[in-house]
């Protein structure tokens, strides 16, 4: 390429490249912005994110932050747009004083990966400070004998700004005696002064009032003024004069107290007192000078009396004056400039920031642990700092910028070998002798969450009495975690599920920290016998690990339900049962039967009946079955018996305390021929004592015929079924119908039942016993939910038969508790022993029953396990401490054999589908028994 005028383009390009390279080397790794001082909050400084090459979307995820070592609140970054803006007032004079350069150094730190950028924000000076004189008024005493061009120094004004804003110009108010002498730029040390241009005449002008104004170079201009009061003196014409107007001295900053700085000398041409000189600091000297230096008034020697610090002030300007003893006194002035020389007297300072502790043991080499910055207040070589780390540790220091280091992981960690490291970082400067400082870093190796909380056993069983107070503490679960710190911090919670129509959390609460299990509301054994749920234990690790434990809460029964009387049969009014009894009946005739139920279980539902005594000394020919509730005659009735009897039957359970109910039975004795008549009058409402009798002849005849017919059909059907049954067991046969039994735990519904005949070698069997398996809570291995009680009361055929008529015990059966339940053996009977009453239940063991009666027997019983479909060989009433026994009556007893235990549970309204044909057969037989019972009544 040919250029005109012989210009070489290659040299131009080379020069441009050198300039660009030098600029790049000077500013590598930094951004530079500028902002004027006193900028308002929110003023734009620069697009720092864009200039650093960072995307706005990664500022928050990478934890973008700005760190300032001294004043961190002056500038902020908007993480939404990446703009650096002014956050608070910036005062350049407060921040940097009179330094020519003033900048704020920022450290921009981002993580993932960790990066550090350095940004310098230059603070531009504005003209916000006016010139200020040391005093608002200055008094000058000038002898009238002073010659022309005499110079009188003045203390100039000071301006806190810099540059052109601090360039001051002075002007003096118009006068004929003085003009203002302003030093040039190369005479900055020379003070401002007044120059006499006309001889003074005290007699003509004894005083002068002048105004000195200082104006800075800023825009707009700011000014400051001082009043000059000049007093013209007579006689003493010569003032002291120093050898030099400026003395310069250099002192090390560690100079000792009492060291002589300089001995300035002044002379006075006058004689006598007018020539005697007294040295002192000028009146406008700063307090800082007075605290560091002392001047002898006679010799003028200046000595050190305070500590000197190069880092605080690098030079001290001392104004000195020499005053003679004339009247008025005259003064001469000079300036002593003390330059402070730096020495290595400051140890390095270490600062740790952004600690990433503790560090997981699976951290990768190169992971940054912390950022370390070092700073030394000394200058030059004394301020150059190098850092080192404790040897033989899996960490190292990496220099990221001048005086900035990163502590990073050098190799893999093993928490099982070393769980923590104590590191020492040493910073050493380049002075002589060298100074150093250390900082300790405790690096803890964190465990990873690899162990789930574990319970001591997979499930627990808890027993709680019903009617517990709300908020009752029933159990405490505890799980251990082999991890450390938060990975071993276990919290507990309830595994929510539905319990019927309600949430499990409405019943149970688990304390998250202690694992205490609380029952939130009173429990009812009649509604809920077993509550099975799970408690979850979860640690605080990331990700969290957990495990569950199963709690089985059995609700124990309490005697909180009184016996409830069943509704009387038709014909009773006013809550009383009315019965007509012919006088011709004999002993043992059943007059009526009181029926009651109890919603509790076990002994709390075991009911007994007794007659309340009437008038004192009176006897009645009636008795009530202790456990059947049947009212029967104790002897044959005769004419001496009263025609009407009011019987009060007390029904009570065996709970603690016992609860009772009372039934009223009105018995009227009538002649066989008078019964229809009395009943007729009663039905017509005729007045008289027989008006309350009911005419039942017609109904009685119809009932007898119907019952007789049903009885014959039932017997025929029963005989046919017995003959057709398999005879594999000899005289004993098995039938498996589905029945409902009223027992000490209420009305039970069972899917399997076995009727087993008690066989004797001496003769045919005398009694049958209906035996059932109660619906007890299953063991821990069971997965079935507890059965809820059914509020619908309906009685099966077998239950109605037990209520309305006698049940002849022809077969004996054995009941067993659920799997895992306590073994209690049904009492045995001696068929050769006569008993006073048929079908009565003996009291608990130890109540005084003779040795020939049925008694309780405890022991392991027959160890043989029942197979599927077979009848269990043991029986227990839940909630009872012992088994009740039924005593067999003698065959020749005249008392009706219809006594039967009346338990109080409600029957479930919905039954399972009938599984076998024998179930239907058993129901038919129960209907036949019910019909027979009705005929007996």
Curated annotation (Swiss-Prot):
InterPro entries: Cadherin-like_dom (IPR002126), Cadherin-like_sf (IPR015919), Cadherin_CBD (IPR031904), Cadherin_CS (IPR020894), Cadherin_N (IPR013164), Protocadherin/Cadherin-CA (IPR050174). Pfam families: Cadherin, Cadherin_2, Cadherin_tail. It is a single-pass type I membrane protein. GO terms for molecular function: calcium ion binding; identical protein binding. Glycans are attached at residues 254, 265, 548. The keyword Cell division does not apply. One of its GO terms (cellular component) is plasma membrane. Disulfide bonds join 96-102. Residues 719-937 are cytoplasmic. Residues 775-787 have a biased composition (Polar residues). It comes from the Eukaryota. Keywords: Calcium, Cell adhesion, Cell membrane, Disulfide bond, Glycoprotein, Membrane, Metal-binding, Repeat, Signal, Transmembrane, Transmembrane helix. PXXP repeats lie at residues 774-777, 786-789, 819-822, 860-863, 878-881. Residues 30-133, 134-242, 243-350, 351-455, 456-565, 581-678 form the Cadherin domain. Cadherin 1 to cadherin 4 domains mediate homophilic trans-interaction, the interaction with an identical protocadherin expressed by a neighboring cell. This is a head-to-tail interaction, the cadherin 1 domain interacting with the cadherin 4 domain and the cadherin 2 domain interacting the cadherin 3 domain of the other protocadherin. The cadherin 6 domain mediates promiscuous interactions with protocadherins on the same cell membrane. Each cadherin domain binds three calcium ions. Forms homodimers in trans (molecules expressed by two different cells). Forms promiscuous heterodimers in cis (at the plasma membrane of the same cell) with other protocadherins. This is Protocadherin alpha-7. It comes from Pan troglodytes (Chimpanzee).
């Amino acid at each position: 390429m040919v250029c005109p005028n012989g210009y070489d383009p290659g040299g131009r390009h080379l020069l441009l490249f050198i300039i660009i390279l030098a600029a790049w080397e000077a500013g590598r790794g930094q951004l530079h912005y500028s902002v004027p001082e006193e900028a308002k909050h929110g003023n734009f400084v620069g697009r720092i994110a864009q200039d650093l090459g960072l995307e706005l979307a990664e500022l928050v995820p990478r934890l973008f932050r700005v760190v300032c070592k001294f004043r961190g609140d002056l500038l902020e970054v908007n993480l939404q747009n990446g703009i650096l803006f002014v956050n608070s007032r910036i005062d350049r004079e407060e921040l940097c004083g009179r330094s020519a350069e003033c900048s704020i150094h920022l450290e921009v730190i981002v993580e993932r990966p960790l990066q550090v950028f350095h940004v310098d924000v230059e603070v531009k000076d504005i003209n916000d400070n006016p010139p200020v004189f040391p005093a608002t008024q200055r008094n000058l005493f000038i002898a009238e004998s002073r010659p022309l061009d005499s110079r009188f120094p003045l203390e100039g004004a000071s301006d806190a700004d810099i540059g052109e804003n601090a360039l001051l110009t002075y002007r003096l108010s118009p006068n004929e005696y003085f003009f203002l002498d302003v030093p040039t730029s190369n005479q900055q040390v020379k003070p401002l002064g007044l120059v006499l241009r006309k001889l003074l005449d005290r007699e003509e002008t004894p005083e002068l009032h002048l105004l000195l104004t200082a104006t800075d170079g800023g825009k707009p201009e700011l000014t400051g003024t001082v009043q000059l009061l000049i007093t013209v003196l007579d006689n003493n014409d010569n003032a002291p004069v120093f050898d030099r107007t400026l003395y310069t001295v250099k002192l090390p900053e560690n100079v000792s107290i009492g060291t002589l700085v300089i001995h300035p000398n002044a002379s006075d041409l006058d004689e006598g007192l007018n020539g005697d000189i007294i040295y002192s600091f000028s009146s406008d000297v700063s307090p800082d000078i007075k605290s560091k230096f002392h001047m002898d008034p006679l010799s003028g020697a200046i000595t050190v009396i305070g500590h000197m610090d190069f880092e605080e002030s690098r030079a001290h300007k001392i104004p000195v004056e020499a005053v003679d003893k004339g009247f008025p006194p005259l003064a001469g002035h000079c300036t002593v400039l003390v330059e402070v020389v730096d020495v290595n007297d400051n140890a390095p300072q270490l600062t740790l920031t952004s600690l990433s502790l503790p560090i997981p043991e699976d951290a990768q080499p190169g992971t940054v642990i912390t950022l370390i910055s070092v700073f030394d207040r000394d200058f030059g070589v004394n301020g150059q700092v190098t850092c080192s780390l404790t040897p033989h540790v899996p960490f190292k220091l990496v220099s990221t910028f001048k005086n900035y280091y990163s502590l990073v992981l050098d190799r893999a960690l093993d928490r099982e070998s070393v769980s923590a490291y104590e590191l020492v970082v040493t910073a050493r400067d380049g002075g002589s002798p060298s100074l150093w400082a250390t900082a300790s870093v405790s690096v803890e190796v964190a465990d990873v969450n690899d162990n789930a909380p574990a319970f001591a056993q997979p499930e627990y069983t808890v027993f709680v009495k019903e009617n517990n107070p709300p908020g009752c503490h029933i159990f405490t679960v505890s799980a251990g975690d082999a991890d450390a710190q938060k990975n071993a911090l276990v919290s507990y919670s309830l595994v929510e599920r539905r319990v019927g129509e309600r949430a499990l959390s409405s019943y149970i609460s688990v304390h998250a920290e202690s694992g205490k299990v609380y029952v939130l509301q009173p429990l009812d054994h009649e509604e809920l016998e077993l509550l099975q749920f799970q408690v979850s234990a979860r640690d605080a690790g990331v990700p969290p690990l957990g495990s569950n434990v199963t709690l089985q809460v059995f609700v124990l029964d309490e005697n909180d339900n009184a016996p409830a009387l069943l509704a009387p049969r038709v014909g009773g009014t006013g809550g009383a049962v009315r019965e007509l009894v012919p006088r011709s009946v004999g002993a043992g005739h059943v007059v009526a039967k009181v029926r009651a139920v109890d919603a509790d279980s076990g002994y709390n539902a075991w009911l007994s009946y007794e007659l309340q005594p009437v008038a004192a000394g009176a006897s009645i020919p009636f008795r009530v079955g202790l456990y059947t509730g049947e009212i029967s005659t104790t002897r044959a009735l005769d004419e001496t018996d009263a025609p009407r009897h009011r019987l009060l039957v007390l029904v009570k359970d065996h709970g603690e305390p016992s609860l009772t109910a009372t039934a009223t039975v009105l018995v009227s004795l009538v002649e066989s021929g008078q019964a229809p008549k009395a009943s007729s009058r009663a039905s017509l409402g005729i007045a008289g004592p027989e008006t309350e009798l009911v005419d039942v002849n017609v109904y009685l005849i119809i009932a007898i015929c119907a019952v007789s017919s049903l009885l014959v059909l039932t017997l025929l059907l029963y005989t046919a079924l017995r003959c057709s049954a398999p005879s594999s067991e000899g005289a004993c046969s098995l039938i498996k119908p589905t029945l409902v039994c009223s027992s000490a735990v209420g009305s039970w519904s069972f899917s399997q039942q076995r009727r087993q005949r008690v066989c004797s070698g001496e003769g045919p069997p005398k009694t049958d016993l209906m035996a059932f398996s109660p619906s007890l809570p299953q063991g821990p291995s069971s997965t079935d939910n507890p059965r809820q009680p059914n509020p619908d009361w309906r009685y099966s055929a077998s239950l109605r038969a037990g209520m309305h008529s006698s049940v002849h015990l022809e077969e004996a059966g054995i009941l067993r508790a659920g799997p895992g339940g306590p073994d209690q053996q049904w009492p045995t009977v001696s068929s050769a022993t006569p008993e006073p009453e048929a079908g009565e239940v003996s009291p608990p063991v130890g109540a005084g029953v003779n040795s020939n009666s049925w008694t309780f027997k405890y022991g392991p019983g027959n160890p043989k396990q029942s197979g599927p479909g077979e009848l269990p060989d043991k029986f227990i009433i839940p909630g009872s401490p012992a088994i009740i026994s039924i005593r067999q009556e003698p065959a020749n007893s005249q008392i009706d054999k219809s006594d039967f235990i009346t338990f109080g549970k409600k029957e479930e309204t919905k039954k399972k589908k009938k599984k076998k044909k024998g179930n239907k057969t058993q129901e038919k037989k129960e209907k036949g028994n019910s019909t027979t019972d009705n005929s007996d009544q």
